[in-house]
Amino acid sequence: MYLDEKSFENVVKNSPIAAIDLCILNESKEILLGKRINHPARSFFFVPGGRIRKGEKLFFCIQRILKSEINYEILEEDFSKISLLGVFQHFYDNNFYGNNLFSSHYVVLVYVIKLKDLKKSKIGIINDQHDEYIWYNDSQSENLLIHPYCKEYLDKL
């Protein structure tokens, strides 16, 4: 179920949001990070992810995130290759508007997916979540602005 902006605002003000984040690893064990355009976490590098919509099964949520954020998809028969990294909580002082009028609370299921298990989507999607992507590994510059919540994932990989 898709919520209009006012309904979503009411949910964010009054309850935690269930979400999924995707740690996508290439064959060199580097993780895909995107520089966030939207609040919260704007301007930080973060993994692809998004909220779970009411009535949306996990497979379809992951598929939607993959298609809309990186233009990839996973076949249903390959879904069993995805592994759960863990369940995390994210607390932000601001919200998707970028103001401090109300905070955000996310309960996040974090999954690990190997790039080789994905295929390029036939439909080109315009990404409105990230404006730059990198393949990151621990040896890269400390000057990258990686979000602390994302660093928690990196520590568990």
Residues covered by each model-derived region:
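NUDIX/MutT-family hydrolases
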Residues: V110-V112, S121-D155
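Hydrophobic (often cysteine-bearing) scaffold residues that line and stabilize catalytic clefts
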Residues: P16, L58, I146, C150
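Conserved Nudix-box catalytic region and its N-terminal flanking loop in Nudix hydrolases
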Residues: E30-E73
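Hydrophobic pocket-lining residues within nucleotide cofactor-binding pockets
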Residues: I52, F88, L115, D138-S141
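Active-site segment of metal-dependent pyrophosphate-handling enzymes
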Residues: Y72-K119
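Acidic, metal-coordinating catalytic segment for phosphate/diphosphate chemistry
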Residues: M1-D21, L25-E27, N100-S103
